[in-house]
């Protein structure tokens, strides 16, 4: 029957809250899991299930299986064609190749130009990942776009979903966590698979920080490049699980060390017809400042927090450092990478780095480096990787995962 508000209500229903006991616990890896295998549950927005699922809205129902494992089965990457070398930068700011390479390890970076777009790079990377995974766009259940620099204020994931041809209209949304974004994307994908019944999740890390750089500031313009990287995370049997554990954190107090804030509006007072003053209304169109960074503080933060985070993730996974085949860090600065590897006692030959060729590509750096390592044959099926992202927020997170 309809109530006064016009909504339909049911007759009184006994309160079952006190009878519901959900057998869920938090595992050592940080994921929520069931204490026992749950029954098959159909998730749908439709109230009734038609016997002929192929001819009714219930065809979009998806089985929810808990617990479930998840694994990485494909990767891809894309970079703009425009290459800017250290020598090129020396023509516009007071710097040189030796100064940049010594302090950062960076030699070149790629920058968007002309008709390049972040969505275009993301689609290219995602297409390559899908091809490697042998998954068609129609079978993607979720698109996660990890970026701080979308082409559209309201996000880029739905545009990517459309461009890829995901005809079943899967959920697509952005994750904003700066250079930690991709790791948080992996965690989000795993949570959706383990608890939401999703099978194939596309995780993309892509950023174009060159659009927010002050190209007259040699302290920041030398660091950043543009790129996109993607992986396909797929549901699997729990015994084949390939994402063993994670460790994630934020510290808002550290925002002062790395940020790109909204510029303050400068409004003239406006008087209405009755003489009242509107003051700052209506606001003028806002924009973001260029990236502001205290490099020394960011370095201290990274070399302290990242090793602790990786050690915590290893402990949750029940693995010693010796079980890790590769250390894959966010490609921010070679000094940071070397310092973290030293503190964790990882030899240089087990550390993945492509920073020299691309610079700091923010959320794209980890999947970009992973894709190159996989396609070059360095990372092989069955290899275990410790990865960690860290950056603005401040945010940082680590994951222990197995490739395929």
UniProtKB/Swiss-Prot annotation:
Keyword Metal-binding on entry: no
Active site as annotated: 179, 330, 360
Superkingdom classification of source: Eukaryota
GO cellular component, one term: chloroplast
Pfam families cross-referenced by the UniProt entry: ACP_syn_III, ACP_syn_III_C
Keywords on record: Chloroplast, Fatty acid biosynthesis, Fatty acid metabolism, Lipid biosynthesis, Lipid metabolism, Plastid, Transferase, Transit peptide
GO biological process: fatty acid biosynthetic process
Keyword Secreted: no
Catalysed reactions, semicolon-separated: malonyl-[ACP] + acetyl-CoA + H(+) = 3-oxobutanoyl-[ACP] + CO2 + CoA
Name of the top EC class for this enzyme: transferase
Subcellular location(s) per record: Plastid, Chloroplast
Residue span of the annotated presequence: 1-43
Known pathway: Lipid metabolism; fatty acid biosynthesis
InterPro entries in the cross-refs: ACP_syn_III_C, ACP_syn_III_N, FabH, Thiolase-like
GO molecular function, one term: beta-ketoacyl-acyl-carrier-protein synthase III activity
Family: Belongs to the thiolase-like superfamily. FabH family.
PANTHER family to which the protein is assigned, alphabetical: 3-OXOACYL-[ACYL-CARRIER-PROTEIN] SYNTHASE (PTHR43091), BETA-KETOACYL-[ACYL-CARRIER-PROTEIN] SYNTHASE III, CHLOROPLASTIC (PTHR43091:SF1)
Known function: Catalyzes the condensation reaction of fatty acid synthesis by the addition to an acyl acceptor of two carbons from malonyl-ACP. KAS III catalyzes the first condensation reaction which initiates fatty acid synthesis and may therefore play a role in governing the total rate of fatty acid production. Possesses both acetoacetyl-ACP synthase and acetyl transacylase activities.
HAMAP family given in the database record: FabH
Protein name as annotated: Beta-ketoacyl-[acyl-carrier-protein] synthase III, chloroplastic
Species whose genome carries this gene: Arabidopsis thaliana
